[in-house]
Amino acid sequence: LISRRVRGLGVEADLLPADTPANALDHYEGIILSGGPASVTEEGAPMPDANVFGLGVPVLGLCYGHHLMVQMLGGSVRSTGRSEYGKAVLEVKDPDRVFDGLEVSQTVWMSHGDLVESLPDGFKVLGITADCPTAAIGNTDDNLYGLQFHPEVHHTPKGVDILRNF
């Protein structure tokens, strides 16, 4: 679904396995780490090549990808013990790149059981919801962004705009 949304924006998109070596990705203009059913708190969770964050291209982590990026770069993620599933109201605190030109309050779709507990160095909170104080984060110097919500689904009305901004 993510690739379909990106292609719908007129951008070429390839769907690659999580274990693709970073040196095979250096010709891309951006990388999206997708969501999925796994948890970074579990043994054997799929992990990308850590060098993906040093390629000098923008990286967007969505849900599980958001958790991966945080954990791999030195932040922490914990299981909430329950799932958040459904609509939430995102309050944009810093209208950086991904939220440029968008409303400061918008509906987003959540589907997760883990939560970012602490941010890696260089990251800041870009948006929050009532139940998620790290719903959108970014390291704007390195063009690394993480979203707890799912911009690719139609339940996030401005999701395509967020992907376009990325």
Model-assigned labels for residue ranges:
Residues 2-62, 66-67, 71-73, 164-165:
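Flexible gly/pro-rich beta->alpha loop and the following alpha-helix that scaffold active-site loops
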Residues 119-122, 128-166:
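A glycine-centered loop/beta-turn motif at secondary-structure junctions
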Residues 25, 86-93, 119, 137, ...:
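Short, charged, surface-exposed secondary-structure boundary motifs
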Residues 56-60, 107, 124, 143:
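Proline-centered loop/turn at the N-terminus of a beta-strand
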Residues 63, 112, 150:
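Histidine-centered divalent metal-coordination motifs
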Residues 17, 50, 57, 67-113, ...:
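A conserved active-site-flanking secondary-structure segment within enzyme catalytic domains
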Residues 2-5, 72-76, 102, 122, ...:
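Residue-level signal for well-ordered alpha-helical positions
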